[in-house]
């Protein structure tokens, strides 16, 4: 379950890193 959660969070984390936030 942990691996699945990480795979689900991966795109979200990348989006956060790539998105310019103040």
Swiss-Prot record:
GO terms for cellular component: extracellular region. The keyword 4Fe-4S does not apply. It is found in: Secreted. Signal peptide: none annotated. Its main location: secreted. Expressed by the venom gland. One of its GO terms (biological process) is defense response to bacterium. Keywords: Antibiotic, Antimicrobial, Immunity, Innate immunity, Secreted. Transmembrane segments: none annotated. It comes from the Eukaryota. The keyword Secreted applies. Antibacterial peptide. Acts on the Mycobacterium abscessus subsp. massiliense cell wall. Reduces 40-50% of the bacterial load in macrophages infected with different M.abscessus strains. Is not cytotoxic towards mammalian cells, and shows no hemolytic activity against human erythrocytes. In vivo, reduces the bacterial load in the lungs, spleen, and liver of highly susceptible mice intravenously infected with M.abscessus. This is Polydim-I. It comes from Polybia dimorpha (Neotropical wasp).
């Amino acid at each position: 379950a942990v691996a699945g959660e990480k795979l689900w969070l991966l795109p979200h984390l990348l989006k956060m890193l790539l998105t310019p936030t103040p």
